[in-house]
Every structure is written in structure tokens, then in C-alpha cells.
């Protein structure tokens, strides 16, 4: 298989759509892994371009998606944002017969070719279990939720909360869950407002 791939003259172009991030944040490691894969598989006549969207601006995701569609790559790796914005993009990819995979967050209603990441619902369930090992007798707890344009920050965040609430309902039904919605701002704006 390796020899036939090397013998092929076809060039493949892949595009990754990731949220903009600061050096050292979670997405830095993801991007490093992408660059390592590019170097490792450079013999396969592939090129990979990374496009970014502003995670605090859903319209930025739409604009970045449109730019990718115009290039008509051979495949796309996308870190999904809110499902309603991701679905528009993936519907167009399907119409163009461009395969796509998700990284970090899975949207089951819009199934990809593959998904690489954790089960967000199980993660939330586990987080509640760990928290209640320390807060066992508490009568109230607070969930802090990132909200942007009236929408819970991400599909992943929403699924974590579902798992969290499921654990609490099953194991601590008398504990009241309070919500505090934090209206999302960029990290640099949060730092300016804190000072």
C-alpha cells in the first residue's frame, strides 16, 4: 500500500478548520500534532492547510467555511462550533462529496466520516462524580456556563453539562443545581476587564 501511494502522482489537499488560539492553549497541541503528521507523511503527496475561525464569533466560522468550500479540498478536518453553524458547512461538504472528520467535539446529528476526541457526555458525568467526592453533603452547587450570542458556548460544553446533570440526578437528586451564565468575551478582553 505504501509503495502504491508513493507511485501515485495524485496530490491531495486537506484543510483543517480550528479555532484561533493563543500559544500554550489546548489547540496549540492539536496544531503541533497536525504539523508532525504532515512531516511524517510528506511522502504521500499531501498538503495540509490550517484555517482558523474566531471562537467568539459564529460568523467567523461561516466565513472560514465558505473560504474552504471555494478551494474544494480532498478532505476537511473541522473542530465544530455550535451545531446549527456546523451543519450548514457539513451539508455543503456532503453536497460536494468532500469527506470530513471532526476533532474534539462530535455532533451526532451531523455524522462525519470519523471523530477524534473524547465522549463529552461521559466527561461531564465523570466530572460530577469527582466533584461530589469532595462536595458529598452539599445541598447546592453551581454550574458556570459560557454563553455566546445566546447559545451555550459549544456542542461539547452542552454535552458535558448533560452528562453532569445525569450523574447528579442519578446519585444526588436532592442537590440543587444553580446556573451562572458567563457571557463569553475573548481572553484578552477578559484580562482587560479584570484589571
Predicted regions, residues:
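Short beta-strand segments enriched in small/hydrophobic residues
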Residues: 2-31, 113-114, 140-152
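Periplasmic-binding protein-like
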Residues: 17, 68-80, 99-103, 142-145, ...
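Signal peptide-proximal N-terminal region
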Residues: 35-50, 169-175
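Structural motif
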Residues: 47-72, 177-195
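Hydrophobic alpha-helical
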Residues: 68, 75-95, 164, 182-195
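Flexible loop/hinge segments that line or gate small-molecule binding clefts
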Residues: 84-122, 146
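Hydrophobic alpha-helical segments within soluble ligand-binding/sensing domains
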Residues: 115-141, 192-195
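An alpha-beta-alpha
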Residues: 127-172, 179
